[in-house]
Amino acid sequence: MALNYFNANNDWFIGYGNKQLSRLAEQLYLELSQLLQQGITPKIILAQSDTVAFIASFIAACAAGCPVFLCNPNWVNQEWQQVFELVQPNLIWSDRPSVKQQQVYPVQTLNSQIQNHIMIPTGGSSGKIRFATHTWDTLSASVQGFKEYFQLDQINSFCVLPLYHVSGLMQFFRSFTTNGKLINLPFKTVEAGDIPDIDPTDFFISLVPTQLQRLLQNPALANWLSKFKTVLLGGAPAWEELLEQARNYSIRLAPTYGMTETASQIVTLKPEDFLNGANNCGKILPHAKVSILSPTNQILETNKIGIVTVEAKSLALGYYPNLFNQELFKLDDLGYFDDKGYLNIIGRNSNKIITGGENVYPTEVEAAIRATNLVNDVCVIGKDDPIWGQAVTAIYVPCDKSVTPTTIKAAIADKLSKFKQPKYWIQLENLPRNYQGKINCLQLLQIATLHQNPSQLASDS
């Protein structure tokens, strides 16, 4: 099935040799076919940094029905050790010598349950790598829901996100399977203003909040973004100031809610709603069903905060090597549907801070601190405290040396209830975020633990 799309869409990949891509995919497919004829179905590690090699390898593996594990070529040794122990691959496709020289495992009888499966890496905020198990069908269901929601037949994608991640992979997959066009460039190239001569009005571009923030710092790039058909925004929560800035440039932003497990977005705010002032996640795409449940699994009514729960045709089968034992996927996110049917996400349930018996949601505190314009970055966590149970702790990057905890505390004094205001403040040069802008919460907790000396913290006593 995968190879057939080449014949229908010969010039889909802009800026690259489509014939070269097609030939490489067919060559790799023939190599796999020879193994299959010998009764060998290899588990493949795919860690190509070259775009053409990655796409050709992915298509060949899918066409041959071999289980393929998408990997970040830039993982460090500790991460690769995790991956090799978990996957035990039989074949490695990579242009990185340090990866290629890894010892492969002898082929054993393959569990037929994982044939034709596509394993996509996800680490969440824990930093531990695991793989969500997808198929061509689950990815196709995501594309179909996208097409119906935006009422399109062809999807053109301008991709600046890594193809091994669901955020980049689905941009390629949408264009490839709908006879659309694909442009793939490193984000740094776009940020430098080296942009191909294309009409953005026909394209979707996907960004994470930190990328949007950096592009908006350049008025020329902000104006360029405003010409796109739609600018999808996901990967991490966006802050209100950033959304307002995008709105001021008339950027057709579409904040999304989704994850690796759902093959990207299942809820999206349409650009028209965003430009009219909405700041929520939008409405559910046709291929998904989202419910808000109580702790006792009762469906909650409108405007009641509960646990976000998902059913979707695009839902992963499980985390490799295990399968989910039910179709209902309960998330760690808390949210609610408003009167108009829009999904609003409050934050992660596991990130909720209980301090002195009161519930505090970090996103609210972070938004108040960001609104002061005194910090370049901030993350709020709960630090174990013998008196409060947990103490609200702000870890921040100041805009300049003159900014102190006292300065910020004064600026938010009338913006947050007393119990929501941070009791501890930790200043860093930068926060540990991945390329998507997601915080490594475990690392931040370790940093907070190291700051045990009260003299190192500005305590709000």
What are the language-model segments listed below?
Residues 24-27, 31-74, 160, 359:
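Conserved AMP-binding/adenylate-forming
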Residues 117-144:
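Conserved AMP-binding A3 loop
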Residues 140-156, 164-204:
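Conserved AMP-binding/adenylation subdomain of ANL enzymes
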Residues 204-207, 216-276:
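Gly/Ser/Thr-rich phosphate-binding loop
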Residues 277, 289-310, 339-340, 401-405, ...:
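Conserved beta-loop-beta connector loops within the AMP-binding
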Residues 283-287, 298-327, 358-360:
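Conserved ATP/PPi-binding loop(s) of AMP-dependent carboxylate-activating enzymes
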Residues 334-420:
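AMP-binding/adenylate-forming catalytic core of the ANL superfamily
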Residues 416-439:
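AMP-binding/adenylate-forming catalytic domain of the ANL superfamily
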